Amino acid sequence: MSKSLKKLVEESREKNQPEVDMSDRGISSMLDVNGLFSLAHITQLVLSHNKLTTVPPNVAELKNLEVLNFFNNQIEELPTQISSLQKLKHLNLGMNRLNTLPRGFGSSRLLEVLELTYNNLNEHSLPGNFFYLTTLRALYLSDNDFEILPPDIGKLTKLQILSLRDNDLISLPKEIGELTQLKELHIQGNRLTVLPPELGNLDLTGQKQVFKAENNPWVTPIADQFQLGVSHVFEYIRSETYKYLYGRHMQANPEPPKKNNDKSKKISRKPLAAKNK
Protein backbone atom coordinates (compact mmCIF):
# COMPACT_ATOMS: atom_id res chain seq x y z
CA MET A 1 0.00 0.00 0.00
CA SER A 2 1.40 3.41 -0.96
CA LYS A 3 2.38 5.83 1.78
CA SER A 4 -0.20 8.34 0.61
CA LEU A 5 -3.04 5.80 1.05
CA LYS A 6 -1.70 4.77 4.44
CA LYS A 7 -1.55 8.44 5.41
CA LEU A 8 -5.15 8.98 4.27
CA VAL A 9 -6.37 6.14 6.48
CA GLU A 10 -4.32 7.29 9.48
CA GLU A 11 -5.42 10.92 9.14
CA SER A 12 -9.06 9.95 8.88
CA ARG A 13 -8.78 7.81 12.00
CA GLU A 14 -6.75 10.28 14.07
CA LYS A 15 -8.67 13.42 13.08
CA ASN A 16 -12.02 11.65 12.84
CA GLN A 17 -12.43 12.95 9.28
CA PRO A 18 -15.79 11.86 7.85
CA GLU A 19 -14.82 12.00 4.16
CA VAL A 20 -12.15 9.87 2.49
CA ASP A 21 -11.21 10.40 -1.17
CA MET A 22 -9.13 7.63 -2.75
CA SER A 23 -10.01 8.35 -6.36
CA ASP A 24 -7.52 7.65 -9.15
CA ARG A 25 -4.96 5.79 -7.01
CA GLY A 26 -4.61 2.60 -9.07
CA ILE A 27 -6.32 0.53 -6.36
CA SER A 28 -7.20 -2.98 -7.58
CA SER A 29 -8.58 -4.31 -4.28
CA MET A 30 -10.12 -2.57 -1.28
CA LEU A 31 -8.48 -5.27 0.86
CA ASP A 32 -5.07 -3.87 -0.13
CA VAL A 33 -5.87 -0.62 1.69
CA ASN A 34 -4.83 -1.56 5.24
CA GLY A 35 -7.15 -0.23 7.90
CA LEU A 36 -9.83 0.95 5.47
CA PHE A 37 -12.55 -1.20 7.02
CA SER A 38 -11.70 0.02 10.51
CA LEU A 39 -12.90 3.52 9.56
CA ALA A 40 -16.42 2.86 10.82
CA HIS A 41 -16.94 6.58 11.45
CA ILE A 42 -16.67 7.75 7.82
CA THR A 43 -19.77 8.99 6.01
CA GLN A 44 -18.27 9.41 2.54
CA LEU A 45 -15.90 7.14 0.60
CA VAL A 46 -14.80 7.94 -2.95
CA LEU A 47 -13.04 5.16 -4.89
CA SER A 48 -13.78 6.37 -8.42
CA HIS A 49 -11.30 5.92 -11.32
CA ASN A 50 -9.53 2.89 -9.86
CA LYS A 51 -9.15 -0.75 -10.98
CA LEU A 52 -11.52 -2.52 -8.60
CA THR A 53 -13.14 -5.70 -9.94
CA THR A 54 -15.03 -6.69 -6.79
CA VAL A 55 -16.34 -5.17 -3.59
CA PRO A 56 -15.56 -7.31 -0.52
CA PRO A 57 -18.26 -8.20 2.04
CA ASN A 58 -16.24 -6.17 4.58
CA VAL A 59 -17.84 -3.04 3.11
CA ALA A 60 -20.65 -3.68 5.62
CA GLU A 61 -18.26 -2.61 8.40
CA LEU A 62 -18.42 0.98 7.12
CA LYS A 63 -21.86 1.23 8.65
CA ASN A 64 -22.08 5.04 8.76
CA LEU A 65 -21.53 5.56 5.02
CA GLU A 66 -23.97 7.97 3.40
CA VAL A 67 -22.08 8.43 0.11
CA LEU A 68 -20.23 5.61 -1.68
CA ASN A 69 -18.66 6.29 -5.07
CA PHE A 70 -17.28 3.49 -7.27
CA PHE A 71 -17.58 5.38 -10.59
CA ASN A 72 -15.31 4.13 -13.39
CA ASN A 73 -13.91 0.86 -12.09
CA GLN A 74 -14.21 -2.71 -13.43
CA ILE A 75 -16.62 -4.08 -10.84
CA GLU A 76 -18.44 -7.19 -12.09
CA GLU A 77 -20.46 -8.05 -9.00
CA LEU A 78 -21.50 -6.70 -5.63
CA PRO A 79 -21.78 -8.53 -2.31
CA THR A 80 -25.22 -8.89 -0.73
CA GLN A 81 -23.71 -7.10 2.27
CA ILE A 82 -23.86 -3.78 0.43
CA SER A 83 -27.55 -3.58 1.29
CA SER A 84 -26.68 -3.61 5.01
CA LEU A 85 -25.36 -0.04 4.68
CA GLN A 86 -28.59 1.32 6.05
CA LYS A 87 -27.49 4.98 6.15
CA LEU A 88 -26.50 5.06 2.47
CA LYS A 89 -28.11 7.92 0.54
CA HIS A 90 -25.97 8.15 -2.59
CA LEU A 91 -24.48 5.14 -4.41
CA ASN A 92 -22.51 5.64 -7.62
CA LEU A 93 -21.74 2.48 -9.59
CA GLY A 94 -21.62 4.15 -13.00
CA MET A 95 -19.16 2.94 -15.63
CA ASN A 96 -18.50 -0.55 -14.31
CA ARG A 97 -19.14 -4.09 -15.60
CA LEU A 98 -22.20 -5.14 -13.62
CA ASN A 99 -24.46 -7.78 -15.19
CA THR A 100 -26.66 -8.19 -12.15
CA LEU A 101 -27.44 -6.69 -8.75
CA PRO A 102 -27.35 -8.81 -5.58
CA ARG A 103 -30.50 -10.13 -3.94
CA GLY A 104 -31.75 -7.90 -1.18
CA PHE A 105 -30.39 -4.83 -2.96
CA GLY A 106 -33.72 -3.03 -2.54
CA SER A 107 -33.58 -3.01 1.25
CA SER A 108 -31.58 0.23 1.51
CA ARG A 109 -34.06 2.37 3.41
CA LEU A 110 -32.59 5.84 2.81
CA LEU A 111 -31.12 5.61 -0.71
CA GLU A 112 -31.94 8.73 -2.71
CA VAL A 113 -29.55 8.67 -5.67
CA LEU A 114 -28.58 5.48 -7.53
CA GLU A 115 -26.17 5.82 -10.44
CA LEU A 116 -25.91 2.70 -12.64
CA THR A 117 -25.08 4.32 -15.99
CA TYR A 118 -22.85 2.39 -18.40
CA ASN A 119 -23.02 -1.15 -17.11
CA ASN A 120 -24.36 -4.37 -18.68
CA LEU A 121 -27.70 -4.46 -16.86
CA ASN A 122 -31.14 -5.42 -18.19
CA GLU A 123 -34.60 -6.11 -16.80
CA HIS A 124 -33.47 -9.58 -15.64
CA SER A 125 -30.58 -8.10 -13.64
CA LEU A 126 -32.77 -6.51 -10.98
CA PRO A 127 -33.51 -8.41 -7.76
CA GLY A 128 -37.12 -8.94 -6.74
CA ASN A 129 -37.07 -6.19 -4.14
CA PHE A 130 -35.37 -3.55 -6.32
CA PHE A 131 -38.50 -1.43 -6.51
CA TYR A 132 -38.73 -1.32 -2.71
CA LEU A 133 -36.26 1.57 -2.99
CA THR A 134 -39.14 3.99 -2.51
CA THR A 135 -36.90 6.79 -1.18
CA LEU A 136 -35.15 7.16 -4.56
CA ARG A 137 -35.19 10.66 -6.03
CA ALA A 138 -32.82 9.97 -8.94
CA LEU A 139 -32.28 6.72 -10.86
CA TYR A 140 -29.73 6.61 -13.67
CA LEU A 141 -29.94 3.51 -15.89
CA SER A 142 -28.59 4.97 -19.15
CA ASP A 143 -26.22 3.01 -21.40
CA ASN A 144 -27.41 -0.42 -20.33
CA ASP A 145 -29.36 -3.19 -22.09
CA PHE A 146 -32.96 -2.77 -20.94
CA GLU A 147 -35.62 -3.76 -23.49
CA ILE A 148 -38.44 -3.54 -20.96
CA LEU A 149 -38.87 -1.23 -17.99
CA PRO A 150 -40.66 -3.29 -15.30
CA PRO A 151 -44.16 -2.00 -14.37
CA ASP A 152 -43.03 -1.81 -10.74
CA ILE A 153 -41.22 1.41 -11.69
CA GLY A 154 -44.53 3.02 -10.67
CA LYS A 155 -43.71 2.26 -7.02
CA LEU A 156 -40.84 4.74 -7.01
CA THR A 157 -43.21 7.66 -6.48
CA LYS A 158 -40.53 10.05 -5.16
CA LEU A 159 -38.48 9.91 -8.36
CA GLN A 160 -37.61 13.31 -9.76
CA ILE A 161 -35.01 12.16 -12.30
CA LEU A 162 -35.21 8.99 -14.41
CA SER A 163 -32.54 8.48 -17.03
CA LEU A 164 -32.98 5.62 -19.52
CA ARG A 165 -30.98 7.01 -22.42
CA ASP A 166 -29.25 4.61 -24.85
CA ASN A 167 -30.80 1.31 -23.84
CA ASP A 168 -32.80 -1.03 -26.10
CA LEU A 169 -36.25 -0.09 -24.77
CA ILE A 170 -39.09 -1.15 -27.06
CA SER A 171 -41.87 0.16 -24.81
CA LEU A 172 -42.60 2.07 -21.62
CA PRO A 173 -45.09 0.74 -19.05
CA LYS A 174 -48.26 2.72 -18.33
CA GLU A 175 -47.13 2.83 -14.68
CA ILE A 176 -44.62 5.51 -15.61
CA GLY A 177 -47.59 7.86 -15.38
CA GLU A 178 -47.63 7.29 -11.60
CA LEU A 179 -44.31 9.11 -11.16
CA THR A 180 -46.01 12.44 -10.59
CA GLN A 181 -42.95 14.11 -9.01
CA LEU A 182 -40.80 13.47 -12.09
CA LYS A 183 -38.98 16.56 -13.34
CA GLU A 184 -36.55 14.91 -15.77
CA LEU A 185 -37.11 11.97 -18.11
CA HIS A 186 -34.39 10.89 -20.54
CA ILE A 187 -35.44 8.22 -23.05
CA GLN A 188 -33.40 9.20 -26.10
CA GLY A 189 -31.55 6.59 -28.15
CA ASN A 190 -33.91 3.63 -27.65
CA ARG A 191 -36.25 1.62 -29.92
CA LEU A 192 -39.47 3.32 -28.84
CA THR A 193 -42.22 3.83 -31.40
CA VAL A 194 -45.09 4.96 -29.13
CA LEU A 195 -45.62 6.51 -25.70
CA PRO A 196 -48.19 5.27 -23.17
CA PRO A 197 -51.06 7.80 -22.85
CA GLU A 198 -50.50 7.70 -19.08
CA LEU A 199 -47.26 9.63 -19.62
CA GLY A 200 -49.60 12.55 -20.20
CA ASN A 201 -50.32 12.55 -16.44
CA LEU A 202 -46.87 14.05 -15.91
CA ASP A 203 -45.84 17.67 -16.18
CA LEU A 204 -42.64 17.55 -18.22
CA THR A 205 -43.15 20.55 -20.48
CA GLY A 206 -42.40 23.47 -18.12
CA GLN A 207 -39.23 25.57 -18.16
CA LYS A 208 -37.79 23.67 -15.18
CA GLN A 209 -38.64 20.23 -16.58
CA VAL A 210 -36.55 18.11 -18.95
CA PHE A 211 -37.94 15.61 -21.47
CA LYS A 212 -35.42 14.17 -23.93
CA ALA A 213 -36.64 11.65 -26.49
CA GLU A 214 -34.70 12.07 -29.74
CA ASN A 215 -33.21 9.18 -31.71
CA ASN A 216 -36.20 6.86 -31.40
CA PRO A 217 -38.13 5.38 -34.37
CA TRP A 218 -41.44 7.10 -33.48
CA VAL A 219 -44.61 6.34 -35.41
CA THR A 220 -45.41 9.17 -37.82
CA PRO A 221 -48.12 10.94 -35.73
CA ILE A 222 -45.75 11.23 -32.74
CA ALA A 223 -42.78 12.19 -34.91
CA ASP A 224 -44.92 14.98 -36.41
CA GLN A 225 -45.72 16.32 -32.94
CA PHE A 226 -42.04 16.29 -31.97
CA GLN A 227 -41.42 18.56 -34.96
CA LEU A 228 -43.77 21.07 -33.33
CA GLY A 229 -42.32 20.75 -29.82
CA VAL A 230 -42.54 18.73 -26.60
CA SER A 231 -45.71 20.47 -25.39
CA HIS A 232 -47.47 19.35 -28.59
CA VAL A 233 -46.38 15.75 -27.96
CA PHE A 234 -47.92 15.78 -24.48
CA GLU A 235 -51.08 17.46 -25.72
CA TYR A 236 -51.39 14.79 -28.41
CA ILE A 237 -50.85 11.74 -26.16
CA ARG A 238 -53.56 13.07 -23.83
CA SER A 239 -56.10 13.15 -26.68
CA GLU A 240 -58.83 10.55 -27.19
CA THR A 241 -57.63 10.13 -30.78
CA TYR A 242 -54.21 9.05 -29.60
CA LYS A 243 -55.57 6.76 -26.89
CA TYR A 244 -57.57 4.96 -29.57
CA LEU A 245 -54.59 4.70 -31.93
CA TYR A 246 -52.33 3.53 -29.09
CA GLY A 247 -54.81 0.80 -28.15
CA ARG A 248 -54.96 -0.39 -31.77
CA HIS A 249 -51.17 -0.31 -32.03
CA MET A 250 -50.67 -2.39 -28.89
CA GLN A 251 -53.34 -4.91 -29.94
CA ALA A 252 -51.57 -5.41 -33.25
CA ASN A 253 -48.41 -6.32 -31.31
CA PRO A 254 -46.05 -5.15 -34.07
CA GLU A 255 -42.52 -6.45 -34.47
CA PRO A 256 -40.18 -4.17 -32.47
CA PRO A 257 -37.60 -2.17 -34.43
CA LYS A 258 -34.23 -3.82 -34.87
CA LYS A 259 -31.43 -2.95 -32.48
CA ASN A 260 -29.41 -0.10 -33.88
CA ASN A 261 -26.86 0.23 -31.08
CA ASP A 262 -23.88 -2.10 -31.42
CA LYS A 263 -22.87 -2.48 -27.80
CA SER A 264 -20.27 -5.18 -28.36
CA LYS A 265 -17.57 -2.51 -28.41
CA LYS A 266 -18.53 -1.04 -25.04
CA ILE A 267 -15.59 -0.82 -22.64
CA SER A 268 -17.68 -2.76 -20.13
CA ARG A 269 -17.81 -5.74 -22.54
CA LYS A 270 -14.12 -5.99 -23.31
CA PRO A 271 -11.97 -8.56 -21.52
CA LEU A 272 -10.25 -6.99 -18.52
CA ALA A 273 -6.76 -7.64 -19.90
CA ALA A 274 -7.67 -5.74 -23.05
CA LYS A 275 -9.05 -2.86 -21.02
CA ASN A 276 -5.94 -2.52 -18.91
CA LYS A 277 -3.52 -2.26 -21.81
Swiss-Prot record:
Gene name per UniProt: Rsu1
Q: Which residues carry this modification: N-acetylserine?
A: S2
Provide the alphabetized UniProt keywords: Acetylation, Leucine-rich repeat, Repeat
Q: Which domain of life is it from?
A: Eukaryota
Q: Which SUPFAM superfamilies does the record associate with it? A: L domain-like
Read off the PROSITE patterns from this record.
LRR
Q: What does it do?
A: Potentially plays a role in the Ras signal transduction pathway. Capable of suppressing v-Ras transformation in vitro.
Name of the protein this chain belongs to: Ras suppressor protein 1
Q: Give the GO biological process terms.
A: neural precursor cell proliferation; positive regulation of neural precursor cell proliferation; Ras protein signal transduction
> Which PANTHER family does UniProt cross-reference here?
PTHR48051, RAS SUPPRESSOR PROTEIN 1
- Region called Disordered, residue ranges: 1-23, 250-277
Composition-biased stretches, type Basic and acidic residues, lie in 7-23, 256-265
Q: Where are the LRR repeats?
A: 41-63, 64-85, 87-108, 110-133, 135-156, 158-179, 181-202
